Curated annotation (Swiss-Prot):
Domain of life of the organism encoding this protein: Eukaryota
Record protein name field: Putative thiosulfate sulfurtransferase, mitochondrial
Record-annotated membrane-spanning stretches: none
EC number: 2.8.1.1
Coiled coil: none
Cell compartments where the protein resides: Mitochondrion
Catalysed reactions listed for this entry: thiosulfate + hydrogen cyanide = thiocyanate + sulfite + 2 H(+)
Pfam families associated with the record: Rhodanese (PF00581)
Keyword NADP among record annotations: no
CDD domains per the UniProt record, alphabetical: RHOD_HSP67B2
Function summary: Thiosulfate sulfurtransferase which catalyzes the transfer of sulfane sulfur from thiosulfate to cyanide.
Species in which this protein is naturally found: Schizosaccharomyces pombe (strain 972 / ATCC 24843) (Fission yeast)
Chain ranges of the Rhodanese domain: 43-140
Amino acid sequence: MFSKTLSVSRLLMTRSFYSSTVVKNVSIFDFEKVYNLSKRPTGDKSTVLIDVREPDEFKQGAIETSYNLPVGKIEEAMKLSDEEFSKTYGFSKPVFEDNVVVYCRSGRRSTTASDILTKLGYKNIGNYTGSWLEWSDKIKSK
């Protein structure tokens, strides 16, 4: 029985290790990094900041310079032509080499979004895991 428990434990540890390696392709962004992104000059398109919450959540408050693309629409959106994407979402479709940073309310949906973008072939993904909850709290003191 002990060896069976040990085998299950090893399996769980192995799964945990391998599932966390996917995250290694994604940079974790903190408040300061995102704050600096939000203060970029208007024409600076070096990084795209995407809020993956639903449109009604986005309308209630969002980080400056961010665009809204709900997590449930990311996969189909990224398959649109550049023109159709821009027309539908109001910003230029990121290319695979662009720096893309995602956030949501608490970090869960942004983690899902970063996984989707990675699987679609995007190379430079950032996840602001503190997301809107942290942002709306910390921005008050800035």
